[in-house]
Amino acid sequence: MASKGTKLIATNKKARHDYFIEETFETGIVLVGTEVKSIRQGKLNIKDGYARVENSEVFLYNVHISPYEQGNIFNKDPLRVRKLLLHKSEIRKLIGYVQQKGYTLIPLSFYLKDGLIKVELGIGVGKKIYDKRQDIAKKDAARRIDKELRQREKQ
């Protein structure tokens, strides 16, 4: 029986660093048995992944799922294109965003939900270099403030 709840498998930290995420969608993904076993072991890389809408279907590209050790002949190409499962209304919404200049579909995380593998897909706009610098400066300032507060509490 499938376990209840969610378990995070992999996150795309680079996506949140390189893009402003405007909206997220929970999607299913079409996988083969050995890919499911490999993902459950956490052997995937989504750092370079992106999604594209083609003929009213959404496909995931450049997500590397390592071959399952005991899979032998049943293993598929690690970088193959995989179909994402969404409702028609969600796909229409994605098409509307992607047709605008600068929007990209990025996989943010893979997780298990009630025994099924789900992908969190985000709609992002690329950050400029100065935006990244501002984010880093804000994080540094927050760290300094936390450090000062901890030092004052110790005294």
Swiss-Prot record:
GO biological process, one term: trans-translation
InterPro entries registered for this protein in UniProt: SmpB, SsrA-bd_prot, SsrA-bd_prot_CS
Gene3D superfamilies membership: 2.40.280.10
GO CC term (a single one): cytosol
GO MF entry, a single one: RNA binding
Parts forming coiled coils: none
Domain of life according to the entry: Bacteria
Entry keyword annotation includes GTP-binding: no
Disulfide bridge map: none
Keywords, comma-separated and alphabetical: Cytoplasm, RNA-binding
Major localization listed first in the record, in broad terms: cytoplasm
Subcellular location: Cytoplasm
Record's function text: Required for rescue of stalled ribosomes mediated by trans-translation. Binds to transfer-messenger RNA (tmRNA), required for stable association of tmRNA with ribosomes. tmRNA and SmpB together mimic tRNA shape, replacing the anticodon stem-loop with SmpB. tmRNA is encoded by the ssrA gene; the 2 termini fold to resemble tRNA(Ala) and it encodes a 'tag peptide', a short internal open reading frame. During trans-translation Ala-aminoacylated tmRNA acts like a tRNA, entering the A-site of stalled ribosomes, displacing the stalled mRNA.
Family statement: Belongs to the SmpB family.
Name of the molecule in the record: SsrA-binding protein
Lineage: Bacteria, Bacillati, Bacillota, Clostridia, Peptostreptococcales
